[in-house]
Amino acid sequence: MFYWLIELTNTFPSLAMFRGLLNVFRYITFRTGGAVVTGALFVFLFGPWIIDHLRLRQGKGQPIRADGPQSHIISKKGTPTMGGLMILSGLVVSTVLWANPLNPYVWIVLAVTLGFGFVGFYDDYLKVTKQSHSGFAGRARILIEAGIALVACYALVRLGRDPSSTGLAIPFFKDLVIKFGWMYVIFGAFVIVGAGNAVNLTDGLDGLAIVPVMIASASFGLIAYLAGNAVFSDYLQIHYVAGTGELAVLCGAVLGAGLGFLWFNAPPASIFMGDTGSLALGGMLGSIAVAVKHEIVLAVIGGLFVLEAVSVIVQVASFKLTGKRIFKMAPIHHHFEQLGWTEPQIVIRFWIISVMLALVGLSTLKLR
């Protein structure tokens, strides 16, 4: 919306004297900074009201797994969930205010984010109303997520109108691209659905998921800015995707809204993100990675999410095949709880790992 202020100087000659001042709204970097501040302020201001409303509506709050760490039954009982509504509200308001409203990439990513958020909201709703840890049926949930992701990937490929838009670039190699053709739509959907559920599995401790999400968002905001700039992408020899630079504004909105949410989610949490937030944010990261053609880099920057997801897959597969569990409990953050690590130790150490993985992922931009 603010992006259009510069157009007012062209429509109304009397405002021409303000053109120099309003010209800053042309710059993605300025609007990204504005999105960060707006997202954070929105959640800071409206967060307490949302938390009180959810606590009143939910009563007992999110049901705690009986087979999970016993400490959670006492420390986390009664805490409301669906805190993702705070993040999504701040994200949407900030993005609408600061992003170019004519950019299709912004709307596609927002659609995926809100679509996954709705699926997560319904899952949270069932858990709270039934007071059961089992919510939305797994297969039905995955099918809906896959449908949203397939439509989004098809739209992204159509936007690209370039043979490379259906290819997979390999980091560290300048010209190595695996060409999928239209099968890329299926691959891209797998990336989006996988990212959504990986973040969902990570969200098991206070503050554990939101900071790695913010780190990944900041990283992909930079990648989107570079990939959407013809000069920078040519210098770095990465795939140029015209228009994706605007996704940096959306990433800034996520960073700001995430900072606001962390204020209330810091241990001991006043509210949980819930599937409403974790599925939405994971789907957002996946769709941005597909849009800017850095799918493999997402697996590096979001390596913590990959680790959490793989730990669950390995645990389930091992138990079904051998009757034995590899980890004391999955996802892997619960394994460390069982080993005696305190919740703050796990959370902060996982944050450190996320920072290191982000630096490794960003280094792939230059190492070609």
From Swiss-Prot:
It catalyses: UDP-N-acetyl-alpha-D-muramoyl-L-alanyl-gamma-D-glutamyl-meso-2,6-diaminopimeloyl-D-alanyl-D-alanine + di-trans,octa-cis-undecaprenyl phosphate = di-trans,octa-cis-undecaprenyl diphospho-N-acetyl-alpha-D-muramoyl-L-alanyl-D-glutamyl-meso-2,6-diaminopimeloyl-D-alanyl-D-alanine + UMP. Pfam families: Glycos_transf_4 (PF00953), MraY_sig1 (PF10555). The chain crosses the membrane at residues 34-54, 79-99, 102-122, 140-160, 176-196, 207-227, 247-267, 271-291, 296-316, 345-365. It is an enzyme of class 2 (transferase). Catalyzes the initial step of the lipid cycle reactions in the biosynthesis of the cell wall peptidoglycan: transfers peptidoglycan precursor phospho-MurNAc-pentapeptide from UDP-MurNAc-pentapeptide onto the lipid carrier undecaprenyl phosphate, yielding undecaprenyl-pyrophosphoryl-MurNAc-pentapeptide, known as lipid I. Belongs to the glycosyltransferase 4 family. MraY subfamily. This is Phospho-N-acetylmuramoyl-pentapeptide-transferase. It comes from Bradyrhizobium sp. (strain BTAi1 / ATCC BAA-1182). The lineage of its organism: Bacteria, Pseudomonadati, Pseudomonadota, Alphaproteobacteria, Hyphomicrobiales. The gene is mraY.
